[in-house]
Curated annotation (Swiss-Prot):
GO cellular component: host cell cytoplasm; host cell nucleus; host cell plasma membrane; membrane; T=4 icosahedral viral capsid; viral envelope; virion membrane
UniProt KW Transferase keyword: no
Name the UniProt record assigns to this protein: Structural polyprotein
Top-level taxonomy: Viruses, Riboviria, Orthornavirae, Kitrinoviricota, Alsuviricetes
Lipidation residue positions, type S-palmitoyl cysteine: 730, 750-751
Gene3D superfamilies in the record: 1.10.287.2230, 2.60.40.350, Alphavirus E2 glycoprotein, A domain, Alphavirus E2 glycoprotein, domain B, Alphavirus E2 glycoprotein, domain C, Tick-borne Encephalitis virus Glycoprotein, domain 1, Trypsin-like serine proteases
Site (Cleavage) residue list: 275-276, 334-335, 757-758, 812-813
One BP annotation, GO: clathrin-dependent endocytosis of virus by host cell
Pfam families xrefs: Alpha_E1_glycop, Alpha_E2_glycop, Alpha_E3_glycop, Peptidase_S3
Segments in the Extracellular topological domain: 276-701, 758-772, 817-1224
Length: 1254
């Protein structure tokens, strides 16, 4: 699960046999402590055997002897040979002399691996060292006929020809270059811009290339390697190394490389150091010296060495000085000492513990700090005791040493207990730090038993398991998926974090004072001094002693105080220890067990059961642990949801044609798109048509049905009213005339009895004979009314909802078009040029990157409160010194320690003073756990396009800015700018744990306590730290020496708890957010204008292409709103065989094919996508056109897992069947109205004619 295996893993559980085992004889149990000691002895022997095997030189003579030894043998003659042979024989028979063996032993070089051997072979003639003062300061290499050397590397190239070349400087790339002579060009490297992710080779082994960055394991490569090349498997140079920076367990390299166009590109990580071999100088007594070669070391002059380290504590070469001071020159180096041996400069101490077995006490195992910020369940403690050292200060694994009233004692680490709610498993310890794995609890206790006395110390601290990912599990799973996390390193490597040390102050030790008879005796420990202060009968005594001395003036132990003095050991700068008088010599040592990037196994929640509906998705969830469900719409408004689900639940969501995404726990995101489908049949009966359109367009369908119902109702009502009025108008004259006969037609129409009157034919005959113009007008009135009503109904109701787009074609070889900015959607078009055959163009964007220009404002992380040991002055006053550290607070407290009581044991009562100082610094794990605040500016867009022009194809990267062209085969392509200047990033963004957040952070220097940005630094390693944490010092109690304070909680920790989901889950338009560099990919927004400049050579004359004499198009199958769900078959007769471009000038259909092969006679199958129910489009084949039309059916699947590659600006049209039913309905209503109008007209004509006749 974790990248660091525990030092002593627990044994696996034995297999359980389901059958009963036979009874075994009883044996007495062994003592568990004896078994532990045996195991410790076995481990020690195994480690010793392993080290001896590893350090043993290889057997037999060396493969090749040095030239110096060979020349000495020739000069020495036969006598020397005899002596050497005799010496060899004696060495075989007798045991070797250990002193001589150690003195003559040379460090055996490890045999280089295959990668190193290959690089060394290639470097031999093509890489040249740059010498400075007799040392290799860097390297120069010859690549592609040019000499490259880093500009920051001073010195002369170790080649007379190359050293004489006059170089040109490129300060932007930190390089100097020159053309090499012609006779040397055959031996130069070749370079390449191809850099697939994987491993490459250089002088020190393998180099990993990932996400545009070259990294090597930490410790591989150092100063002096600047200018070395990185090679691929074919021996081509992919990059030149300039420097590096440590990033946890790996080192990121600063390199110069080449892009696809052969242009030099430089990549430099933050806080990168140049790797020229520049000697760092340190200072001692106003004399400078190389930090790696100090004049003194700790084993010979410990006090002077600590003073030297204190003077150079802020020097950039402090680490080199510390390593050299610990390892004296000529001293034998053991592999265990190389791990972490600098803590021999320190000693353990006793400090106040707030909760021992019975209240507070002065404990040898006081707990200073506890941290458990990793995702692996481990806890790192800092205590007053030390680990890995014995009582004498020598390295000894699995051992704890502690201070017991001035005497340093040791105890095996397995006898130390650590527990929270249950016992913890101690992994290892180094210096003041202990690494353990503990169960959850609200406090942590450490204890051990020595000489029947149990020592313990407890501190309140909530220990809990911190899960990583989107599932809140409480224990690491056995199976799952690997995810990036932060774990505590199980080693003591230098990872850039320090803990502050200083010389211990004068500690009162009452055990040194005893009463012998009637006088006081002070006995200092062996090898140390003691400061004695007494006040006996008005006589004050103050002197330093290094052996036992009696003071006859004093008769009581309370009259004297004895202080232990030691200036050859450091202690941790704890607030529980008093500060030494005068200028305190400070230092710093490395902190082990820091957080590092690793891989953790996280659980996978059971897959949700998905049920698809019409534009909806139902998720049935069964989480084992509390699991987050995150959803968003892939449109302009994401409408994201973020819900923690702990119990089985069902959630329903709406899915649109633009897409919907959900993330369940630690599963990868899943996306779904809705299709233009619905129940019913758009080509069926009226109720099926209504059902279909009601589900697709509910509001429009309801509105249309309401209008139709209103028209029918009005029509029926109007017809009825007209009929009644006509009947009344017809019958009224006859009712008023006695014995009048009603004509037969009126009697039938008006349901009246017939009466004698002039008939219709008689009236028409009268008009024909007397007024023929009126006769024709009377006949044309009903026909005119019918025509007018029909036209009005068609204008009102028959609105065609189609959008027609112009085809993308250009009459010349300069062609401009626009394609959607959506990855994976192919865009096909043709170029029509007079006299030439159509030229097909196909463009498919495979990836679209939007990279903003960002500026790092500051870095913030969890803070650590540093406290100086309090300065205590008895019988006197003090003042605060000027403060210069971040958020530093200083305060003087008077009257803190009563007379001869309390932590200071002062002789005065109220004149005693204490100066308390506290300040803020970055936490030890800030390098691994921090957030970066950026300001984002104008974004650049890169499109990775697969372009086909005619029969020529290329995969290229285009900057979508409207200015940068791409050329291939004579075609010049310019893309952009984007139609929509849009970006998912706000002006202020925060990067944390590989994810990006839009967050309005405070400006640099304006942080508030308890909020994001309470501490700010320009970079992780810079010293310009700003802090505002509301740090307030409190008055100390007299019982113990300490520095109490209050402080606001960490704003960074609070932000981590309260932060919303990152842009990875909330960005609009389905953007995919990545880091290194910060970018958004595949945002489906806007369109990309394209301009083509096509040479004449790519066009084909019309005479050389086929011509269709007859063509007929039939739609075999058609599913609208589906991914190329239409199949068209074109039967044709061509003039000759050949290849023709196909295209649809309108936007009704999108073709899958850009060209088809034609024979003299046959058929061609073409796939297309459309959003119309009744598509009708003109298909261009070469220079001929053929019309395709037919009916399309809705898709069967409601939800699909990929977007639809058709023109999504179209919506499905109303089917012809629906229009037929609609016009029939409206036509029926119109017939009633027309009949009523005709009747009214006939009646009016008849009445008027009859009145005129009478």
């Amino acid at each position: 699960m974790f990248p660091f295996q525990p030092m002593y893993p627990m044994q696996p559980m034995p297999y359980r046999n389901p059958f009963a085992a036979p009874r075994r004889p009883w044996f007495p149990r062994t003592d568990p402590f004896l078994a532990m000691q045996v195991q410790e002895l076995t481990r020690s022997m195994a480690n010793l055997t392993f080290k001896q095997r590893r350090d043993a030189p290889p057997e037999g003579p060396s493969a090749k002897k040095p030239k110096k030894e060979a020349s000495q043998k020739q000069k020495g003659g036969g006598q020397g040979k005899k002596k050497k042979n005799q010496g060899k024989k004696k060495a075989k028979t007798g045991p070797p002399n250990p002193k001589a063996q150690n003195g003559n032993k040379k460090k055996t070089n490890k045999k280089p691996g295959k990668r190193q051997r290959m690089v060394m072979k290639l470097e031999s003639d093509k890489t040249f060292p740059i010498m400075l003062e007799g040392k290799i300061n860097g390297y120069a290499c010859v690549v592609g006929g040019k000499l490259f050397r880093p500009m920051h590397v001073e010195g002369k190239i170790d080649n007379d020809v190359l050293a004489a070349l006059k170089t040109k400087k490129a300060s932007k790339y930190d390089l100097e270059y020159a053309d090499v002579p012609q006779n040397m060009r055959a031996d130069t490297f070749k370079y390449t811009h191809e850099k697939p992710q994987g491993y490459y080779s250089w002088h020190h082994g393998a180099v990993q290339y990932e996400n545009g960055r070259f990294t090597v394991p930490k410790g591989v490569g150092a100063k002096g390697d600047s200018g070395r090349p990185i090679l691929d498997n074919q021996g081509r140079v992919v990059a030149i190394v300039l420097g590096g920076v440590n990033e946890g367990s790996r080192t990121a390299l600063s390199v110069v490389m080449w892009n696809e166009k052969g242009v030099t590109v430089k990549y430099t990580p933050e806080n990168c150091e140049q790797w020229s071999l520049v000697t760092t100088m340190c200072l001692l007594a106003n004399v400078t010296f190389p930090c790696a070669q100090p004049p003194i070391c700790y084993d010979r002059k410990p006090a002077e060495t600590l003073a030297m380290l204190s003077v150079n504590v802020d020097n950039p070469g402090y680490d080199e000085l510390l390593e050299a001071a610990v390892k004296c020159p000529g001293r034998k180096r053991r592999s265990t000492e190389e791990l972490f041996n600098e803590y021999k400069l320190t000693r353990p101490y006793m400090a106040r513990c707030i909760r021992c077995a019975v209240g507070s006490c002065h404990s040898p195992i006081a707990i200073e700090a506890v941290k458990s910020d990793g995702h692996d369940g481990y806890v790192r403690l800092q205590t007053s005791s030390q680990y890995g050292l014995d009582s004498s200060g020598n390295l000894k694994g699995r051992t704890m040493r502690y201070d017991m009233h001035g005497t340093i004692k040791e105890i095996p680490l397995h006898q130390v207990s650590l527990y929270t709610s249950r016992p913890c498993h101690i992994v290892d310890g180094h210096g003041y730090f202990l690494l353990a794995r503990c169960p959850a609890g609200d406090s942590i206790t450490m204890e051990f038993k020595k000489d029947s006395v149990r020592h313990s110390c407890s501190v309140p601290y909530e220990v809990k398991f911190n899960p990583v990912g989107r599932e809140l599990y409480t224990h690491p799973p056995e199976h799952g998926v690997e995810q990036a996390c932060q774990v505590y390193a199980h080693d003591a490597q230098n990872r850039g974090a320090y803990v502050e040390m200083h010389l211990p102050g004068s500690e009162v030790d009452s055990s040194l004072v005893s009463l012998s008879g009637s006088s006081v005796t002070v006995t200092p420990p062996d090898g140390t001094s003691a400061l004695v202060e007494c006040e006996c009968g008005g006589t004050k005594i103050s002197e330093t002693i290094n052996k036992t001395k009696q003071f006859s003036q004093c008769t009581k132990k309370e009259q004297c105080r004895a202080y232990r003095l030691q200036n050859d050991k450091w202690v941790y700068n704890s607030d529980k220890l008093p500060k030494a008088a005068g200028a305190t010599l400070k230092g710093k040592l490395h902190v082990p067990f820091l957080l590092a990037d690793g891989k953790c196994t996280v659980p996978l929640a059971p897959e949700p059961m998905i049920t698809f509906g019409f534009r909806s998705v139902s998720l049935k969830l069964h989480p084992k642990n509390p699991t987050y469900l995150i959803t968003r719409q892939l449109a302009d408004e994401p409408h994201y949801t973020h819900e923690l689900i702990s119990e089985p639940a069902v959630r329903n969501f709406t899915v649109t044609e633009k897409g919907w995404e959900f993330v369940w726990g630690n599963h990868p995101p899943k996306r779904f798109w809705a299709q233009e489908t619905a129940p019913g049949n758009p080509h069926g009966l009226p109720h099926e048509v209504i059902t279909h359109y009601y589900h697709r367009y509910p509001m429009s369908t309801i509105l249309g049905l309401s209008i139709c119902a209103a028209i029918a109702t009005v029509s029926v009502a109007a017809s009825t009213w007209l009929f009644c009025r006509s009947r009344v108008a017809c019958l009224t004259p006859y009712r008023l005339t006695p014995n009048a006969r009603i004509p037969f037609c009126l009697a039938v129409l008006c349901c009246a009895r017939t009466a004698r009157a002039e008939t219709t034919w008689e009236s028409l005959d009268h008009l024909w004979n007397n007024n023929q113009q009126m006769f024709w007008i009377q006949l044309l009135i009903p026909l005119a009314a019918l025509i007018v009503v029909t036209r009005l109904l068609r204008c009102v109701c028959c609105v065609v909802p189609f959008l027609v787009m112009a085809g993308a074609a250009a009459p010349a070889y300069e062609h401009a078009t626009t394609m959607p900015s959506q990855a994976g959607i192919s865009y096909n078009t043709i170029v029509n040029r007079a006299g030439y055959a159509p030229l097909p163009i196909s463009i498919t964007p495979t990836k679209i990157k939007l990279i903003p220009t960002v500026n790092l404002e500051y870095v913030t992380c969890h803070y650590k409160t540093g406290m100086d040991s309090p300065a205590i002055k008895c019988c006197g006053s003090q003042e605060c010194t000027p403060t210069y550290r971040p958020d530093e607070q200083c305060k003087v407290f008077t009257g803190v320690y009563p007379f001869m009581w309390g932590g200071a044991y002062c002789f005065c009562d109220t004149e005693n003073t204490q100066v308390s100082k506290a300040y803020v610094m970055k936490s030890d794990d800030c390098l691994a756990d921090h957030a970066e605040a950026y300001k984002a500016h104008t974004a650049s867009v890169q499109a990775f396009l697969n372009i086909t022009v005619g029969e020529h194809s290329i995969v290229t990267t285009v900057y979508v800015n409207g200015e940068t062209p791409v050329n291939f085969n004579g075609v010049k392509i310019t893309a952009g700018p984007l139609s929509t200047a849009w970006t998912p990033f706000d002006r202020k963004i925060v990067q944390y744990a590989g994810e990006i957040y839009n967050y309005d952070f405070p400006e640099y220097g304006a942080g508030q306590p308890g909020a994001f940005g309470d501490i700010q630094s320009r970079t992780v390693s810079s010293s310009d730290l700003y802090a505002n944490t509301n740090l307030v010092l409190q008055r100390p109690k007299a019982g113990a020496i300490h520095v109490p304070y209050t402080q606001a909680p960490s704003g960074f920790e609070q932000w981590k708890k309260d932060k919303a989901p990152s842009l990875k889950f909330t960005a609009p338009f389905g953007c995919e957010i990545y880091t290194n560099p910060i970018r958004a990919e595949n945002c489906a927004v806007g369109s990309i204008p394209l301009a083509f400049d096509i040479p004449d050579a790519l066009f084909t004359r019309v005479s050389e292409t086929p011509t269709l004499s007859a063509a007929e198009c039939t739609l075999n199958e058609c599913v609208y709103s589906s991914d190329f769900g239409g199949i068209a078959t074109v039967k044709y007769s061509a003039s000759k065989s050949g290849k023709c471009a196909v295209h649809v000038p309108s936007g009704t259909a999108t073709l899958k094919e850009a060209a088809v092969e034609l024979t003299e006679q046959g058929s061609a199958t073409i796939h297309f996508s459309t959003a119309n129910i009744h598509p009708e489009f003109r298909l261009q084949i070469c220079t001929s056109y053929v019309t395709c039309k037919g009916d399309c059916h809705p898709p069967k699947d409601h939800i699909v897992t990929h977007p639809q590659y058709h023109a999504q600006t179209f919506t499905a049209a109303v089917s012809k069947t629906a229009w037929t039913w609609l016009t029939s309905l409206l036509g029926g209503s119109a017939v009633i109205i027309i009949i009523g109008l005709v009747l009214a007209t006939i009646v009016a004509m008849y009445v008027l004619t009859n009145q005129k006749h009478n």
